[in-house]
């Protein structure tokens, strides 16, 4: 049996009856295995005129006849042609019907969790509120994945597509951000868990960056806001910069200052004296029970409790005055007079004075005659030197130019002078 498949396009069906019959006959003749039965079916189509439709039900032979039905044999032939047409597009028809059925079912049985993949703000807010109220969806804090609260919860087709898109987007974002940032899960940081060596390395790198940032922030703190130890070291350096001869440098450390000053102890300040002489508030109770070593302060503490013995008074000038009233005073030496210089000193002192060169006498500032300073004169008082007057060329006396002499006269004069020299040697 030969299967006939003809593409019935609108352009093909719009032809006349005679033209349609001719084209069908040509098509049947081109078949490798011609069939006589098929030829009879095609030739029978030329007998009837299909006015209503191309292959319509109402077939009329003559214009006067009304409603004449075709024979069963012709209807069977028409069904065969339609089946041959449908077999060619069976897959396309089934695919279209399945898509229509799926879309129809989606409109009726919508998704349980409401994920429609839209990026609208209201839709996302509605989805989040709905999932939060009913408890259908939640995120695991450990795996960071979406989980279902109920075991019997079903996931629709849209949920699968949305979840797949979300995973792909998340993987792309991780690959993109891996070179820029290092993200560490919060539960790993709190519990101290490290799943892999890669996460451990990332965590150590993040800690190093955090410490470096803290150090940078500490360097930014002004000197007035730093620890009191640093301020105390600076005060010590400021107090000893004159005595030790060191230049004042505010960042001079305690160890360097101690080495440069020759290990001199710093002067006790008010704060240190208070902490040394009295008990600190942070002193534990065990230290209070044990006896403390003897110190200089013990005598000071005992003084208010017991009366002090009478101490001998220091010697004063009045004691000598009392003794002088009862004892006669010795003869006091005479004051120096002018006659002492007249007495001749011994010979040794005279020789020593002769050997010493006389010292130059120093003049006082008021005794030295200062050279008088030159008195400043005004510009109008100074006698200006007369400037030479410029003479014009016509007024200037022109000097007489020397006359030019001929060469012959000069030679004769020279010769006469030479002969005169020879004659009168």
UniProtKB/Swiss-Prot annotation:
Signal peptide: none
Skewed-composition ranges (Basic and acidic residues): 353-395
Superkingdom of the source species: Eukaryota
Residue stretches of biased makeup (Basic residues): 401-414
Annotated region described as Disordered, given as residue ranges: 332-414
Coiled-coil residues: none
Pfam families: NPIP (PF06409)
Database matches in InterPro entries: NPIP (IPR009443), NPIP_N (IPR054697)
Similarity remark: Belongs to the NPIP family.
Listed name of the protein: Nuclear pore complex-interacting protein family member B6
């Amino acid at each position: 049996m030969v299967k006939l498949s003809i593409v019935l396009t609108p352009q093909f069906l719009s032809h006349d009856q005679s033209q349609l019959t001719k084209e069908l006959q040509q098509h049947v003749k081109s078949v490798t295995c011609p069939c006589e039965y098929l030829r009879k079916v095609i030739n029978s189509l030329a007998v009837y005129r299909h006015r209503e439709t191309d292959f319509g039900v109402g077939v009329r032979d003559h214009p006067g006849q009304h409603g004449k039905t075709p024979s069963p044999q012709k209807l069977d032939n028409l069904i065969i042609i339609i089946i041959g047409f449908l077999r060619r597009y069976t897959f396309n028809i089934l695919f279209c019907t399945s898509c229509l059925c799926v879309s129809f079912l989606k409109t009726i049985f919508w998704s349980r969790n409401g994920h429609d993949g839209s990026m609208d703000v209201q839709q996302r807010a509605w989805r989040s509120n709905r999932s939060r109220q009913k408890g259908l969806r939640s995120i695991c804090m450990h795996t960071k994945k979406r989980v279902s609260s109920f075991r019997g919860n079903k996931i629709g087709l849209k949920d699968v597509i949305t979840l797949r898109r979300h995973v792909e987007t998340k993987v792309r974002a991780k690959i993109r951000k891996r070179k820029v940032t290092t993200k560490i899960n919060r539960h790993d940081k709190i519990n101290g868990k490290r799943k892999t060596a890669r996460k451990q390395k990332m965590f150590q790198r993040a800690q190093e960056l955090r410490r470096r940032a803290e150090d940078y922030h500490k360097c930014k703190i002004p000197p007035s806001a730093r620890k009191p130890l640093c301020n105390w070291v600076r005060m010590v350096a400021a107090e000893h910069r004159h005595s030790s001869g060191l230049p004042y440098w505010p960042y001079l450390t305690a160890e360097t200052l101690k080495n440069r000053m020759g290990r001199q102890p710093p002067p006790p300040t008010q704060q240190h004296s208070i902490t040394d002489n009295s008990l600190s508030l942070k002193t534990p109770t065990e230290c209070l029970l044990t006896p403390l070593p003897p110190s200089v302060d013990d005598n000071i503490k005992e003084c208010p409790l017991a009366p002090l013995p009478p101490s001998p008074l220091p010697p004063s000038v009045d004691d000598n005055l009392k003794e002088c009233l009862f004892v006669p005073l010795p003869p006091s030496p005479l004051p120096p007079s002018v006659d002492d210089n007249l007495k001749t000193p011994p010979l040794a002192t005279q020789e020593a004075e002769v050997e010493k060169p006389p010292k130059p006498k120093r003049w006082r500032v008021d005794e030295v005659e200062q050279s008088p300073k030159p008195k400043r004169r005004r510009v109008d008082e100074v006698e200006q030197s007369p400037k030479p007057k410029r003479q014009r060329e016509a007024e200037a006396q022109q000097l007489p130019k020397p006359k030019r002499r001929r060469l012959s006269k000069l030679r004769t004069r020279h010769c006469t002078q030479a002969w005169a020299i020879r004659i009168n040697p």
